[in-house]
Amino acid sequence: MKLLAALLLVTGLTISPAQAALAAPDIPVANVQAHLNELQRIANANGGNRAHGRPGHKASVDYVKAKLDAAGYQTRIQTFTNSGATGYNLIADWPFGDASQVIMAGGHLDSVTRGPGINDNGSGSAGLLEVALTVARQNVRPAKHLRFGWWGAEELGLVGSTFYVNSLTSAQKSVIKAYVNFDMTGSPNPGYFVYSSSGQPSGSLAIEDLLEAGFAAKGVPTELTSVGGRSDHAAFARAGIPTGGTFSGAEVRKTAAQAQKWGGQANVAFDRCYHQACDTSGNINVTSLDRHTDVIAYALYSLIGA
């Protein structure tokens, strides 16, 4: 923990060991599941998906926004156009903390057209929503400013998050001190991956260490993964913003060593329903969803100085 605190201090992401160990709440996984059930209902009512340009995506945005508005967040919907259709980013600011030091977390809210996308990425989106609502319920007054983003059209090439970052001025980018991404956290044959800081902007190592510490606090071993430009952190990294994230695995098969470490089935994909119609609410490993969501809270509460 001393090393973690030192890394955070050096990179400007200051946090005390006591805060990192004590501040973060245990997020009730049943609440996260309730959000996933609503996203499933939305998909069922809108042609079986929540994809860009389809009514299911806008309905998903409206659901998340209504929850955040009722909790006291300052929200706005940012629109963009891709493939001839309107896309939507949802930005939510907790109206406290130093606005010159912004800690941001996000994940994409759209699915592919083939299915409802409950793991990819209902899981990360729902976890972020419940952490945001927990901040509000606890009436947290952080030292730093907390902002969330739910991105559109990720499945078409990270379109929404790239549009958001490109819309920021240099000054607006400079105040974002960290961006943490959560894309797939409930894979049915789960892994516990932390984004590698290798090749990422200065300050990313502190986020990597913090996320690893969050899992270690729950007794969960991790592996680093190089996600490259595969998810919404990429636009932030290109802007020089420190990034990190967690991931429970997609189409790649779990190795025997990973199955021994984490349980589950060797030589089977982490998520056999990745980008398929079967990515439904029945495609979620609740233990993985619970652990990853708690680590979202651990990281954010630590970074904002809750």
What is the predicted function of each stretch?
Residues 96, 131-145, 169, 301-302, ...:
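Flexible, small-residue-rich helix->loop connector segments that border functional cores
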Residues 105, 109-158, 296:
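Alpha-helical metal-binding/catalytic segments enriched in His/Glu/Asp
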Residues 37, 41-95:
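A non-catalytic alpha/beta surface segment that caps or lines the substrate-entry region
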Residues 22-55, 110, 184-187, 270-277:
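N-terminal capping segment at the start of a domain
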Residues 1-21:
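Secretory targeting and sorting signals
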Residues 151-254:
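Metal-dependent peptidase/peptidase-like ectodomains
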Residues 45-46, 74, 81-85, 96-99, ...:
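Solvent-exposed loop/turn segments at secondary-structure junctions
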Residues 255-306:
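His/Asp/Glu-rich mid-to-C-terminal helical/loop segments that flank catalytic regions of hydrolases
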